């Protein structure tokens, strides 16, 4: 009886893992149409970015990992902005003051300034754009080629090996 229970649990775990792996596989070179508003009121669209290599760093100001991510985003922007790469930090926080996940434009600009981020801050307040890119955890980074296609899937979460910067640099260097 214990053996049957173990087999059932194991089978259930295998199905769960297979399901998770399926959802995690976002096709590379996928073009995603999107429109995001900056904290300065500009609208940035996928069409307006055509011809640019773009880094979209998704995060939230309340999330400690996003604060860590900002250090890497800042370094990435410093290193690649003069090489034709445009970097944006995309907040997933709501612009609705009634939301538990609320952050005003001013709060987001102050947050970016506090952490030395000198890139445009965009808003994905309903999470629709991050979902289109297959972002399933924060923080995550998506890289777009000059045609607006995703260069590989999203890169995100914890980086215990410290290899994230190398992965991003490798993807960007291939696109340049």
Feature roles, as predicted:
Residues 55-56, 87, 141:
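Hydrophobic beta-strand anchors of alpha/beta hydrolase catalytic cores
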Residues 116-120, 134-142:
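Structural micro-motif
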Residues 143-176:
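Thiol-/selenol-based redox modules, centered on thioredoxin-like
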């Amino acid at each position: 009886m214990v053996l049957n229970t173990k087999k059932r649990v194991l089978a259930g775990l295998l199905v769960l893992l297979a399901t998770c792996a399926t959802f995690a596989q976002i096709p590379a070179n996928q073009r995603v149409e999107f429109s995001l508003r900056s904290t300065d009121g500009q609208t940035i669209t996928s069409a307006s970015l055509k011809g640019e290599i773009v880094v979209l760093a998704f995060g939230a100001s309340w999330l400690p990992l996003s604060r860590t991510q900002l250090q890497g985003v800042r370094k990435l922007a410093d290193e690649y902005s003069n090489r034709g790469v445009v970097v944006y930090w995309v907040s997933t926080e709501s612009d609705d003051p009634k939301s538990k996940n609320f952050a005003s434009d001013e709060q987001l600009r102050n947050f970016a300034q506090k952490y030395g981020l000198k890139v445009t801050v965009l808003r994905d307040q309903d999470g629709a754009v991050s979902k289109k890119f297959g972002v399933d955890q924060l923080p995550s980074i998506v890289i777009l080629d000059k045609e607006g296609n995703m260069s590989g899937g999203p890169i995100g979460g914890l980086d215990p090996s410290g290899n994230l910067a190398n992965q991003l640099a490798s993807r960007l260097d291939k696109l340049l």
